[in-house]
């Protein structure tokens, strides 16, 4: 078993409505509170970062599972949505919805379609970010599997 370490440097020179920066490997960006939460809305924010972590982990996990299963695809895309609730000034990351769209080869069998649906579900429970937030953030899956040319 091996532990992998990841590091992030953060700089926040001002107050609540100012702008900071983060740097982690290839990621270098400005950060601030989003406009929807009465911030300046510059760069990214923790809400987008959590959504991005969950979405990238999920789609990479799904692609790896499809490859290991020998399931050929023409296309794999996804949209994800994060829902943050604010009640009495308390911010709670309530739900993440993943909407993967899998397009299989035009000659894929019904067994391939069933396997793609199964892997879409399995990727959610196998992704390390999904496992890390499980029990704190509701995860919802709305997968679409089609044959090429449909």
Swiss-Prot record:
Disulfide bonds: none annotated. Gene3D superfamilies: 3.30.300.20. It holds the Pfam family OsmC. SUPFAM superfamilies: OsmC-like (SSF82784). Belongs to the OsmC/Ohr family. This is Uncharacterized protein YmaD. It comes from Bacillus subtilis (strain 168). The lineage of its organism: Bacteria, Bacillati, Bacillota, Bacilli, Bacillales.
